[in-house]
From Swiss-Prot, chains A, B:
GO terms for cellular component: cytoplasm. It comes from the Bacteria. Its main location: cytoplasm. It comes from Malonomonas rubra. InterPro entries: MadA, NagB/RpiA_transferase-like. This is Acetyl-S-ACP:malonate ACP transferase. One of its GO terms (molecular function) is transferase activity. It is found in: Cytoplasm. Keywords: Cytoplasm, Transferase. Alpha subunit of the biotin-independent and biotin-dependent malonate decarboxylase multienzyme complex (EC 4.1.1.88 and EC 7.2.4.4, respectively). Acts as an acyl-carrier protein (ACP) transferase component. This first step in malonate decarboxylation involves the exchange of an acetyl thioester residue bound to the activated ACP subunit for a malonyl thioester residue. Has a weak activity with acetyl-CoA as substrate. Gene3D superfamilies: Glutaconate Coenzyme A-transferase (3.40.1080.10). Optimum pH is 5.5. The lineage of its organism: Bacteria, Pseudomonadati, Thermodesulfobacteriota, Desulfuromonadia, Desulfuromonadales. It catalyses: acetyl-[ACP] + malonate = malonyl-[ACP] + acetate.
């Protein structure tokens, strides 16, 4: 027989750590903010796997500062597993040697710094994930030992109210606490009774009222004033040639001016095309201010959100038939569930990118920026586990020419995955390239694979100002490449197009120009937008939308 | 300007319904069980979308009986959205005209009845989903109006303890309650204070103590006494030729004797191959009793579970370093998160099927059974949104011959998706067929597509008693079909194999027989199993495993 085994090392260790922090508590689970650093130094060990909550919106910024102030002689070589690293402090923690390894999903403004630290050996990269994939690993091989989360309110028993910006908190807390880990929450306000229990108190070990409210980034706010005529044209093409053509009822919209334009075209051009009630009924979507006119015009039946959006809280609360509102009257977002909906329950993903290669692989990575792709790969892929049928999914599968080579005579649907991009971006950088810059990043950052946001075999349509390429209809890779060249304009890739070949593709409906789609270019301008400014959005909302100061110029 | 719009129809309607039920409550949120039918008649309206909790394990059976006892003159044409329909009452509800439409994931023992009702027009099928996909739609276009859920304990404020069998409850409750819906819970025991808050009281509208504990099915218990020598042989092949070959550390095991055999070979053959610490470290897995010897032998680092398994509760609680155990000392399962882990964080899915066609598409559907596939499509597919790299994923992608036709020169990994099946099943039904019976089901049940569990392009390996077919290594569909023929034995598909072609495939390592793998057939027998009976499993667990009576014969 084997020697007696110990099966509760984790809980014993947790108990020891919590005991070491005992005197830092002022009342039940409450720790005064001035004890924040001491608390982390008591419960964190060198080499620990640590989650620091923070996505592209809410940030456990006070706890991040506390972690950054820990003594790196004691606390070092941490393995950070966290959705995003958008704040300077996130990288400072590596700079100080407190953390060493990073598994994440989104770099945001710190993407260049991540690449720099990788080169300098200050940071070791685990992997770049899509959000839901990272959450998945919290229950597999990347469970956090200690998690630093954030909430609006907390009480002395640890109950948390995360409300509008619930975002990643439930999935982090559950994975950590149920593997004997330690969960520490910063809260904007310590209260006697939380407005609503979003996280049960038993899941939380310590609550700290932070000196100021957590940082929130209005990442999904696009000022209609900045939408260009070209974006209007492309939006009209997408609406008629894809949304209408496939009858897309359930979808996600990413960040960006292209989809903002589409949102603002629904009550105008969308109505003109007679599409209300036929498309855009259900969304997995952050509460985009540019959705207000379409919602007010009765287009939308439901929206489930990954996170909140600064300024949109009151508007969402006043539209409980549309958004997911709790019994207390405030919204609850949930990134894990919304990403799940985005993966399995939507018929289309549409968004922008930085570069598309001649095969149709696309990426926002550049040679010197470890950007990460957030939720895009999860929604911008063909969800192969999907089994339910919708008209648009079935239609795209039916026209997918290469399916027989994969499945024999077995039919299957296909999700619409659309990339919208002008052929040239600012500074005249071409969007279509022979080889993605991601290859150079892979070399520079010593990655196993070039970071691709959307792979060619998942991509079904490209929309540029030149036209739409219907890639699923192509026979084989060569034809797909020809279709891409056909909409790539004056880029190197586009210039290699054979006009005769493009003409044939147009005749077969694989490439469609605005004219092929019956769109009058002279109408494609900003006058088509249902709102032309942030002020228009506020008015349309009846004053419920409260834009952040940086968007207010009246 | 438009006329004044109403944006709170849902909450107004909910309030009206709850008011109608007002006098049925005895104390705060408590409704006596004899008022169960009256409660449902008060809060449910004809045509409602209703969730009735019940997966392949725990069942809200009392509430199902209550629903089945409602007056079909009042309550009819319900649209049921529920994970599974394994109980007779689930179909009775349709028989009585109370429900009309069904969206689900798993039929289990009622699969034939579902097909029958479809033919007779008693039931209209929305779609067959994989679990996570159905959950996804709860946040998109299939949000329940009323959900009938179940828990071990509930208190007067609606707080629920769902513990070991938390399973689907959190995702159902959140989707329903936050879209202004009504959540009714049956509990085994009404208590003053629940052991642990799994569902906050505010998410629950009514709690009913059911007359008897909810039904639990020990679906994942396999008696080692019933494992055959052939299953041992195939298990040895899989361990050496796939688990060991690819170094599979993170995985799921489905239901069945093939994977039960593998679990029981880890402490014997697995150790002999020197694989401990190199494979099978992290699982998304129900607490299979046949995992006990491998856990005790130190193979496993973590297991996150979809649900509980009858008899395994004490064992799991005594192994908190392995399972996900809460602060109260009891386990919390979670199907939504475990399926997410199964989709995005595992390197391999392995399981059995009923039929594989000549192209490699497989299904458990037959002409007269609407079976559904539970979690299999979610885990038995290539997760295209995945971006993190592991050795096994990278290796399978590198040997995937057809990748260049899809992606050009862009490399990508590939998940291992393995089907294990003897070439003939009981009654000598061939496992390999020209055309799946699923085609006939599609015709009989008027489905848009034949229900396929795993599509050919996701399948990477087939293991039969003849050998392993390494499908990802094949060049094109024709060669993949030849490899399938090469392991299909004396089935019609297998008999059409060209021996010369199979020989070439063996030389190229695309087909490997036990001899090619260096496995001595004479050793492939039950003596290799680490436990040969349920009694052995109990002993190995130190008496912690308490098997259900039907498995106890000593």
């Amino acid at each position: 027989m084997q020697k007696e085994k110990v099966w509760d090392k984790l809980s014993t260790d947790t108990e020891e750590r919590m005991n070491a922090a005992n005197e830092l508590f002022s009342d039940r689970k409450v720790v005064p903010s001035q004890n924040g650093v001491a608390l982390l130094e008591a419960v964190i060990r060198a080499g620990d796997r640590i989650n620091l909550e923070g996505n592209n919106q809410k940030q456990a910024d006070f706890l991040a500062e506390c972690l950054g102030s820990c003594d790196s002689e004691k606390i070092n070589n941490l393995h950070m597993v966290q959705s995003a690293v958008p704040l300077p402090i996130h990288l400072d923690i590596f700079d100080k040697g407190i953390a060493k390894k990073l598994d994440f999903a989104y770099g945001g403004p710190m993407a260049a710094k991540v690449a720099e630290f990788l080169r300098e050996g200050k940071l070791e990269l685990g992997a770049i994930h899509t959000y839901l994939e990272l959450f998945a690993r919290y229950f597999m091989d990347l469970t956090p030992r200690v998690s630093l989360i954030c909430a609006y309110e907390g009480d002395k028993d640890g109950n948390l109210y995360t409300g509008f910006n619930t975002e990643d908190t439930p999935v982090i807390a559950e994975a950590t606490k149920f593997r004997q880990g330690i969960v520490i929450a910063q809260v904007n306000k310590l209260v006697d009774k939380v407005q609503r229990v979003d996280i049960p108190g038993e899941w939380v070990d310590a609550v700290i009222e932070s000196p100021k409210p957590f940082y929130l980034e209005p990442l999904f706010t696009r000022d209609p004033a900045n939408i260009t005529d070209t974006q209007v044209l492309m939006g009209m093409m997408a609406l008629k040639g894809i949304y209408g053509e496939y009858g897309v009822q359930r979808l996600n919209h990413g960040i960006g001016f292209f989809t903002a334009a589409i949102e603002l075209l629904l009550p105008t051009y969308g109505n003109e095309l007679g599409l209300k009630g036929k498309i855009c009924k259900h969304f997995a979507l952050n509460p985009h201010p540019t959705m207000i006119p379409a919602i007010e015009d009765g287009w939308v039946e439901s929206i489930h959100s990954f996170g909140g959006e600064l300024g949109m809280q009151k508007y969402c609360e006043a539209r409980p038939d549309i958004f997911f509102i709790g019994p207390d009257g405030s919204m609850r977002s949930n990134r894990a569930y919304s990403q799940t909906a985005g993966h399995y329950a939507t018929d289309m993903f549409i968004g922008g990118t930085l570069q598309i290669d001649k095969y149709g692989n696309s990426s926002t990575a550049t040679a010197s920026r470890v950007a990460g792709f957030g939720g895009a790969p999860n929604m911008g892929c063909d969800a192969k586990g999907r089994r339910h049928v919708t008209d648009s999914w079935l239609k795209c599968g039916a026209e997918f020419e290469d399916q027989a080579a994969l499945l024999g005579d077995m039919p299957r649907g296909k999700r619409l995955v659309v990339q919208m991009q002008e052929t040239f971006k600012e500074k005249m950088d071409p969007s279509f390239v022979e080889k993605l810059d991601a290859w150079n990043l892979a070399k520079n950052a010593n990655l196993d694979l070039a970071p691709v946001m959307i792979y060619s075999d998942d991509l079904t349509h490209i929309v540029t100002e030149e036209g739409i390429a219907y890639l699923a209809k192509c026979r084989g890779l060569e034809e797909r490449m020809a279709a891409i060249r056909g909409v790539a304009g004056y880029t190197e890739v586009g210039l290699s197009a054979d006009p005769k070949e493009t003409k044939t593709l147009r005749e077969r409906g694989i490439v469609k120009t605005p004219e092929d789609l019956g769109i009058d270019r002279s109408r494609a301008n900003r006058s088509m937008l249902a709102a032309k400014s942030v002020k228009d959005l506020v008015d349309c909302s009846g004053g419920l939308y409260e834009p952040p100061a940086r968007f207010v110029n009246w």
